[in-house]
């Protein structure tokens, strides 16, 4: 009985296991079915999302691709913000022919001060290990030991006269604590119309600089990108003060930008009293930045801008809570000669594409094809336009309505423009700095020993005119040994990606400096090249350099630098000759005592000899020997005569050098003309040789 019962129990247990296993399998099957259904639903949702059409505003695009506009990191963002504001200020002042007077202030804002500005209360840390700068006791001990070894090594190097390195900064794994700066730029320019301020600064890709002309900007963003970066890094609006000439009020505007809609978001827009009758603009923006990493770039930019715009006055200030970090630099105005304002020009036929032709047709006020060709393009006269129309084919005539042209006809016009011959565009629309300003700027900032400048005539690249200006200096203050290359495009400095630039490569590889008596390794050489054009062929997304693949520009840069080198060579050769002359005089003076003594001894021996039966000397020689015998002529006499002869030869050579170089080193004498009647004030006429003055 018991055995049977046990068998029954075992059998029942087996049945229960089978039932449980089958129910488990069923559950797994249901779960797998649910998983497949969920996966299918997720795939459908993804497909549905990917099929949705999305759009981005221009502001949103540049916010997501801020590196295109030069906002790669906080340090470069600080540099680019300052640069954009300065260039806007220069454009504004030059547009009304006002000598620019620009003040730039970069103020460091501490974290606690920034939190106070935005109404955020500082909070004490609770979990120290959560933070990136947390350091355990063991790690701290290891770091201090490493720093002690480093300091010991540097002390030994200093004792031996070797170069001492700075201690490496500790780096964490995270981004670290952000640093904030208030950037302010004030100018004396045109100012902005009160009602236009929101759209001028709060709407990306809208402005007054669009058109075919020489412009400083690269993208037409200006302060708008600084505002986008401010919104991304601090969330604070930009503050604008502006007043135009003759206005009795100052426009005050506080605004930011709606990134997704690309429209301005105005917080405050009002008119305030203008007691001082000030005109210009003052922009103030608070952004995240890094002064430490880009301090040198910012100062180099200001110095190079002072070189290319010597007619402007810049006051740069950096303010910090630590007084020893404060910095004030003034770049004084050196001249009041300003370049002409760049003029807007029409398109050259060889430089247009099909899309541009369509846009010009949609915007033109001309009715027929003949008028359209004459008035919408440069270098197409009436007779030339008639010849072009005749070449287009039977479907075209001078009276053809431009609005009725088909796509095929537009392609035909475009093809003819690419193949036909046109005169090169003139450079009248360009505004180079000018040789005078470039030379003054170099002298003002570098104080070189020698300087030479050259400006090329207008040349053409793909239908766009360009002018190359170059300057080379030798010596000067704050200039390193070797080549110091300063690059400009449309009168703005280019500081990044120098290695691939056409100016750098030309200076390094295409100029044989030694043939111009210039030592490329030891001399302090400043190479300045400025290229202005209606279209600068920048390379790279950041537009920081000009490519070396454009033959016309590379050839023009090389030619301009060679012209400067030729000027310097003649000056260097004359300088070497003058140095050789001085060395020769010094050497002659050194040997005068020995020569005088030798002559005196020789003459003394001859004079002591018994007189010959037949005369061997001329009468003058006999007289000299008698004077030697009577000690009327001594060694000092010969010294004086030799010294006078050396001085005479030196004077004659100096006079010849002065006549060749155009600079007289002769003593200057005042020349006066006295007026017999009347009392007048006359200016002095000065030259390297004399001063001409009327005396009443």
From Swiss-Prot:
Residues 1-36 are annotated as: Disordered. One of its GO terms (cellular component) is nucleus. The keyword Isomerase applies. It comes from the Eukaryota. It comes from Oryza sativa subsp. japonica (Rice). This is DNA topoisomerase 6 subunit B. GO terms for biological process: cell morphogenesis; DNA endoreduplication; DNA topological change; pattern specification process; response to brassinosteroid; trichome differentiation. Gene3D superfamilies: 1.10.8.50, 3.30.230.10, Histidine kinase-like ATPase, C-terminal domain. InterPro entries: HATPase_C_sf, Ribosomal_Su5_D2-typ_SF, Ribsml_uS5_D2-typ_fold_subgr, TopoVI_B, TopoVI_B_transducer. Homodimer. Heterotetramer of two TOP6A and two TOP6B subunits. Interacts with SPO11-4. It is an enzyme of class 5 (isomerase). It catalyses: ATP-dependent breakage, passage and rejoining of double-stranded DNA. Keywords: ATP-binding, DNA-binding, Isomerase, Nucleotide-binding, Nucleus, Topoisomerase.
């Amino acid at each position: 009985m018991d055995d049977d019962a046990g068998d029954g129990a075992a059998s029942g247990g087996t049945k229960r296991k089978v039932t449980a296993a089958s129910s488990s399998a069923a559950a797994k099957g249901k779960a797998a079915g649910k998983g497949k259904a969920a996966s299918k639903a997720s795939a459908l949702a993804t497909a549905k999302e990917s099929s949705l059409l999305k759009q981005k505003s221009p502001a949103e695009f540049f916010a997501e691709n801020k590196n295109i506009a030069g906002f790669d990191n906080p340090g470069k963002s600080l540099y680019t913000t300052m640069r954009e504001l300065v260039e806007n200020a220069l454009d504004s002042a030059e547009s009304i022919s006002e000598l620019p007077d620009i003040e730039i202030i970069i103020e460091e804002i501490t974290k606690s001060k920034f939190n106070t500005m935005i109404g955020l209360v500082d909070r004490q840390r609770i979990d120290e290990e959560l933070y990136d700068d947390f350091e355990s006791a063991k790690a701290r001990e290891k770091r201090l030991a490493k720093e002690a070894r480093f300091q010991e090594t540097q002390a030994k190097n200093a004792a031996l006269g070797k170069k001492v390195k700075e201690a490496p900064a500790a780096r964490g794994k995270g981004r670290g604590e952000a640093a904030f700066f208030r950037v302010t730029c004030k100018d004396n320019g045109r100012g902005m119309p009160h009602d236009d301020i929101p759209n001028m600064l709060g709407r990306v890709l809208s402005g007054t600089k669009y058109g075919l002309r020489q412009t400083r900007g690269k993208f037409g963003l200006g302060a708008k990108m600084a505002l986008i970066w401010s919104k991304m890094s601090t969330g604070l609006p930009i503050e604008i003060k502006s007043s135009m000439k003759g206005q009795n009020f100052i426009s005050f505007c506080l605004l930011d930008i709606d990134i997704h809609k690309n429209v301005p978001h105005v917080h405050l827009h009002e008119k305030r009293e203008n007691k001082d009758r000030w005109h210009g603009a003052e922009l103030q923006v608070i952004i995240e930045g890094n002064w430490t990493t880009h301090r040198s770039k910012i100062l180099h930019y200001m110095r190079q801008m002072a070189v290319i715009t010597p007619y402007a006055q810049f006051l740069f200030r950096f303010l910090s809570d630590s007084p020893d970090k404060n910095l004030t630099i003034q770049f004084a105005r050196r001249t009041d000669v300003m370049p002409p304002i760049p003029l807007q020009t029409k398109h050259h036929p060889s430089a247009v594409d099909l899309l541009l032709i369509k846009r010009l047709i949609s915007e033109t006020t001309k009715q027929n094809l003949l008028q359209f060709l004459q008035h919408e393009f440069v270098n197409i006269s009436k007779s030339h336009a008639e010849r072009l129309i005749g070449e287009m084919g039977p479907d075209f005539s001078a009276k053809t309505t431009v609005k009725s042209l088909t796509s095929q006809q537009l392609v035909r016009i475009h093809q003819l423009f690419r193949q036909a011959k046109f005169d090169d565009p003139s450079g009248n629309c360009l505004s180079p700095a000018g040789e005078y300003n470039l030379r003054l700027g170099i002298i003002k900032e570098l104080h070189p020993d020698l300087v030479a400048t050259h400006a090329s005539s207008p040349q053409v690249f793909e239908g766009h005119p360009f002018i190359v200006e170059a300057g080379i200096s030798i010596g000067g203050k704050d200039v390193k040994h070797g080549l110091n290359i300063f690059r400009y495009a449309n009168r703005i400095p280019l500081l990044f990606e120098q290695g691939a630039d056409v100016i750098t490569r030309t200076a390094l590889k295409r100029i044989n400096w030694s043939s111009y008596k210039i030592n490329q390794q030891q001399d302090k050489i400043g190479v300045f090249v400025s290229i202005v054009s209606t279209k600068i062929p920048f390379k790279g997304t950041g537009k920081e350099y000009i490519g070396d693949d454009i033959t016309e520009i590379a050839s023009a840069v090389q030619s301009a630098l060679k012209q400067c080198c030729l000027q310097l060579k003649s000056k260097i050769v004359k300088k070497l000759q003058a140095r050789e002359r001085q060395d020769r005089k010094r050497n002659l003076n050194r040997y005068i005592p020995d020569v005088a003594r030798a002559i005196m001894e020789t003459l003394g021996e001859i004079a002591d000899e018994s007189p010959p039966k037949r005369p061997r000397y001329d009468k003058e020689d006999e007289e000299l020997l008698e004077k030697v015998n009577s000690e009327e002529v001594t060694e000092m006499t010969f010294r004086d005569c030799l010294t006078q002869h050396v001085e005479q030869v030196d004077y004659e050579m100096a006079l010849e050098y002065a006549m060749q170089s155009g600079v007289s080193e002769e003593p200057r004498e005042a020349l006066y003309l006295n007026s017999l009647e009347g009392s007048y004030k006359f200016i002095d006429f000065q030259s390297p040789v004399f001063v001409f003055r009327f005396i009443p």
